[in-house]
UniProtKB/Swiss-Prot annotation:
SUPFAM superfamilies: Acetyl-CoA synthetase-like. It is an enzyme of class 1 (oxidoreductase). The lineage of its organism: Eukaryota, Metazoa, Ecdysozoa, Arthropoda, Hexapoda. PROSITE patterns: AMP_BINDING. Produces green light. GO terms for biological process: bioluminescence. This is Luciferin 4-monooxygenase.
């Protein structure tokens, strides 16, 4: 078979700012956290309760839990899981697992029973660390997933409903008076050892278990500490996050922050006033958000009440952010732009990131160090040059080891040459900025035309009466699919279906008109990270409009 690769059209990331350091992900985290512990730095702050955890306290508890897990009988290749909403204790089992070479599978108590049975059935953990909120579901799942031997309560100092608290689990499984300083991290084969089992986004069915190695994680740490693609390492810097920790975006930004000595200020639920007050009170220099929250901030009438002069960066990830909303929010916060990143669970974290001082409206960024990317033609699979749309493919040391017990699905996404096919449509310009247009599977096929929902969503969001919108294809026997939209109107505003359709028709080419109709809804269906749920939108659009 002829080699279709044209090297001129492969985009390479730069050399890393710092070489990747020796040791497992656990060994590196312990070394960094020990350094910040000696400085007295704060690791986590719960902005709602005011509770702080210093690096010294967090490291001590994580090391003691690591020792307890070893004494319980977990060895390299063992498995533990979490089932919890964001809480300040969330990363203690994560760190403990990384310290001893045990794979960690994070889930969230918001999962349905079916999703949790599926997810924990893939990772087969021996121990599940559950929040009090998640306990009932985990107890039920244990009846089906027999690998689960022990349930430990993550967010309680005392035993709860007959289940051991994490503190008491540590006491029971470590010698009296044991100190974290005596704990020894376990060395592992970095390239092979699974560090985390994350859930794929599951946009085409139930999620798959994504195996990420210690090599994947330490490469991510080098990006987190890179002053151009990550952060200036400055212990004590306060960063506000409202991103779910169980998700790849929340997991790897937070672990990266711990390597930098940052104070991670958490908001366990989003409320506009509390959010702005927290930014002010903790003098946060950066905030990390999912796109859903940008629309709220863009229309906020409270911004001027607060002193946000310390804020120098807003970062977005977890789902695509429209160019218009990003620019509008940046203007409102007096910032040059919004820092974006693009990645998949299968690529560990973002592999395209806005470099410091090099943002371009609408772009996701440039290829990170140690990675390369290309755009291929959807039909011929040939590598394309600048400004030509195709499927984005990437290659580098953060690609997953594979899906758990699913070699067939692994081969479908990573080809024989080691390129991961993202399933996203995009292009890059002459300056090597990448633009992600839409999901390949989301494209609406109308009479042979390919219509990207994200483009129509962006058009809808520019209308002053429209607060939020989502677009999907409605099956049609003649055209294949018809573009349709669900729309949330601004408070106090009104529009008819025809007015919305006429507005879109005035902005787009003929094939992109909303022939599938418009439905007015209270909320656009979205996942936890703000990804629009096309399947749910399709179901809404299929239903007949209720007659008054």
């Amino acid at each position: 078979m002829e080699n279709m690769e044209n090297d001129e059209n492969i985009v390479y990331g730069p050399e890393p700012f710092y070489p990747i350091e020796e040791g497992s992900a656990g060994a590196q985290l312990r070394k960094y956290m020990d350094r910040y512990a000696k400085l007295g730095a704060i690791a986590f702050t719960n902005a709602l309760t005011g509770v702080d955890y210093t690096y010294a306290e967090y490291l001590e508890k994580s090391c003691c839990l690591g020792e307890a897990l070893k004494n319980y009988g977990l060895v390299v290749d063992g498995r533990i899981a979490l089932c919890s909403e964001n809480c300040e204790e969330f990363f203690i089992p994560v760190l403990a697992g990384l310290f001893i070479g045990v794979g960690v599978a994070p889930t969230n108590e918001i999962y349905t029973l079916r999703e949790l049975v599926h997810s924990l059935g893939i990772s087969k953990p021996t121990i599940v660390f559950s929040s009090k909120k998640g306990l009932d579901k985990v107890i039920t799942v244990q009846k089906t997933v027999t690998a689960i031997k022990t349930i430990v309560i993550l967010d309680s100092k005392v035993d709860y409903r007959g289940y051991q608290s994490m503190d008491n689990f540590i006491k029971k499984n470590t010698p009296q008076g044991f100190k974290g300083s005596s704990f020894k991290t376990v060395e592992v084969n970095r390239k092979e050892q699974v560090a985390l089992i994350m859930n794929s986004s599951g946009s085409t069915g139930l999620p798959k278990g994504v195996q990420l190695t210690h090599e994947n994680a330490v490469t991510r740490f080098s990006h987190a500490r890179d002053p151009i693609y990550g952060n200036q390492v400055s212990p004590g810097t306060a960063i506000l996050t409202v991103v779910p920790f169980h998700h790849g975006f929340g997991m790897f930004t937070t672990l990266g922050y711990l390597t930098c000595g940052f104070r991670i200020v958490m908001l366990t639920k989003f409320d506009e006033e509390t959010f702005l007050k927290t930014l002010q009170d903790y003098k946060c220099s950066s905030v990390i958000l999912v796109p859903t929250l940008f629309a709220i901030l863009n229309r906020s009438e409270l911004l001027d009440k607060y002193d946000l002069s310390n804020l120098v960066e807003i970062a977005s990830g977890g789902a695509p952010l429209s160019k218009e909303i990003g620019e509008a929010v940046a203007r409102r916060f007096n910032l040059p732009g919004v820092r974006q990143g693009y990645g998949l669970t299968e690529t560990t974290s973002a592999i395209i990131i806005t470099p410091e001082g090099d943002d371009k409206p609408g772009a996701s960024g440039k290829v990170v160090p140690l990675f390369k990317a290309k755009v291929i033609d959807l039909d011929t699979k040939k590598t394309l040059g600048p400004n030509r749309r195709g499927e984005v493919c990437v290659k580098g040391p953060m690609l997953m080891k594979g899906y758990v017990d699913n070699p067939e699905a692994t081969r479908e996404i990573i080809d024989e040459e080691g390129w991961l096919h993202t399933g996203d449509i995009g292009y890059y310009d002459e300056e090597k900025h990448f633009f992600i247009v839409d999901r390949l599977k989301s494209l609406i096929k109308y009479k042979g035309y390919q219509v990207p929902p994200a483009e129509l969503e962006s058009v809808l969001l520019q209308h002053p009466n429209i607060f939020d919108a989502g677009v999907a294809g409605v099956p049609d026997p003649i055209a294949g699919e018809l573009p349709g939209a669900v729309v949330v109107l601004e408070k106090g505003k009104s529009m008819t279906e025809k007015e919305v359709m006429d507005y879109v028709a005035s902005q787009v080419s003929n094939a992109k008109r909303l022939r599938g109709g418009v439905r007015f809804v209270d909320e656009v269906p979205k996942g936890l990270t703000g990804k629009i749920d096309g399947k749910a939108i399709r179901e809404i659009l299929k239903k007949p409009v209720a007659k008054m």
